[in-house]
Amino acid sequence: MKRFVSVVALSGVVSLAGCVAPTPKPNDPYYAPVLPRTPLPSAANNGSIYQAGFEQNLYSDRKAFRVGDIITITLNERTQASKNANSQVAKNSKTGIGLTSLFGGSATTNNPLGGNDLSLDVGYSGDRATKGDSKAAQGNTLTGSITVTVADVLPNGIIAVRGEKWMTLNTGDELVRIAGLVRADDIATDNTVSSTRVADARITYSGTGSFADASQPGWFDRFFLSPLFPF
């Protein structure tokens, strides 16, 4: 019996541990800054004043378009979602069967115990009703800026960017991460682009420390809020 209780307790602890969100850690290699690729040195051509690999476009600007370039993304995220649902189902049914005769005789007989006569009449009635109402609302706002690096340039000119920002405060750390795809045409002349123009964006805002821990329910509360709770 004690062994069974120990197994059940251990299973509960393991299940609750699976409900805990992983704590973000710094220095994730995926979000590490990407350094520009060093061009291979070309053979010097002493017979010409123009050397390959050192040319510059007279009509180009300083907008980021190469691996390792820096882009500042302004965070302008705002989402509002709401949903209402209600349902009501009702059903009434009634059935009655009246027998006046049975095998040629009367279907009603005297009650030997007294009272009303006994009858073979059958009656049934039933009512069923179901009613449900649900409402959900959620809103999020994220503003600010984060500077990231160009991680790759796709063959069609789309720029893949990603990066992170860690801010160490007195009570913990704050983290902002972003990764996505940007069109070169959407980048302003000061190398800024709005987060609303980032395709396939992956934006993370999280933190560690006492403030972040205070917003999380305890392990005992998480059990009652988990799908394992039967009620």
Curated annotation (Swiss-Prot):
Any one of the GO CC terms: cell outer membrane
Lipid attachment, kind N-palmitoyl cysteine: C19
Signal peptide residue numbers: 1-18
Compartment(s) of residence: Cell outer membrane; Bacterial flagellum basal body
Keywords, comma-separated and alphabetical: Bacterial flagellum, Cell outer membrane, Lipoprotein, Membrane, Palmitate, Signal
Molecular-function GO term, any one: cytoskeletal motor activity
Keyword Ligase: no
Pfam families in the cross-refs: FlgH (PF02107)
Gene Ontology BP, a term: bacterial-type flagellum-dependent cell motility
Protein topology in the membrane: Lipid-anchor
Domain of life (superkingdom): Bacteria
InterPro entries, per the entry: Flag_Lring
Lipidation (S-diacylglycerol cysteine): C19
Known function: Assembles around the rod to form the L-ring and probably protects the motor/basal body from shearing forces during rotation.
Family per record: Belongs to the FlgH family.
Subunit structure: The basal body constitutes a major portion of the flagellar organelle and consists of four rings (L,P,S, and M) mounted on a central rod.
NCBIfam families documented for this protein: PRK00249.1-4
UniProt name for this protein: Flagellar L-ring protein
Gene encoding the protein: flgH
